[in-house]
A protein has these predicted regions:
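Beta->alpha turn/N-cap motifs
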Residues: 42, 59-64, 82, 96-98
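Periplasmic solute-binding protein
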Residues: 1-7, 21, 29, 89, ...
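Long, aromatic- and glycine/proline-rich binding clefts that accommodate carbohydrate-like moieties
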Residues: 79, 130-183, 187
């Protein structure tokens, strides 16, 4: 329910962002975050969880079956994204999105939009999400895995109770924004700067990209 933006502009120094960063640093300093987690590749993180070396991870549904196949004896569940104590509002659900668009210079715009409409149709979108083990883009679509698998059903219930949240979608040079934030974040974790300094430096870097 919180944001790194305000009126479409960077707002990294607000109290909510600071609180989240401080919480992560507290966990890092306490040694409860897997060593090297901030520089691991996605698959490395999944393997850490699959092999029982970490007790929790934030991940995609796409890996559920991979985890089951790699370690059939691992018993795990899915829960909503963590929130601060006392928070009662809707919870944002981080997601990786793929977009569909029609080029301005397309000679078949009408046909292209017809295809997009077909893919987003309730029944077709349900089929696509079932094949991909992912959440549908059409809010009325219900993928097959909801009725076939208790774990996926729990995940879908969480999805319906919250809202998709990815503040980097649609932002200018999103990868540069993530990289500049991570660079300052790593320096803060190593003790080279305070949380306030880290957020101020990241804010300055972001503002330059928004000009």
């Amino acid at each position: 329910g919180k944001s790194m933006l305000k009126d479409g502009q960077p707002d990294l120094t607000n109290a909510d962002v600071k609180g989240a960063v401080e919480f992560i640093k507290e966990m890092y300093d306490a040694g409860v975050i897997a060593p090297g987690a901030f520089s691991m590749k996605e698959q490395d993180k999944v393997e850490e969880f699959t092999n029982g070396r970490v007790g929790m991870m934030i991940d995609s549904l796409a890996h559920v079956n991979t985890i089951r196949e790699s370690n059939p004896d691992l018993h795990f569940s899915i829960t909503a994204f963590p929130a601060e104590d006392g928070y009662t509002g809707e919870r944002g659900l981080p997601y990786a999105a793929w977009g569909i668009g029609v080029a301005e210079n397309s000679t078949h715009k009408a046909e292209a939009w017809k295809l997009v409409s077909f893919l987003m149709r309730e029944d077709i979108n349900a089929q696509l999400s079932s094949i991909a083990n992912a959440f549908p883009g059409n809010s009325k679509s219900v993928p097959d895995f909801v009725t076939n698998d208790d774990l996926f059903a729990a995940a879908f219930e969480i999805y319906q109770s919250g809202y998709p949240a990815n503040e980097f979608v649609g932002l200018p040079v999103a990868e540069d924004l993530m990289r500049s934030f991570d660079e300052q974040f790593q320096m803060m974790l190593e003790g080279d700067q305070t949380v306030d300094e880290m957020l101020a430096n990241a804010q300055a870097a972001w503002v330059e990209q928004f000009k």
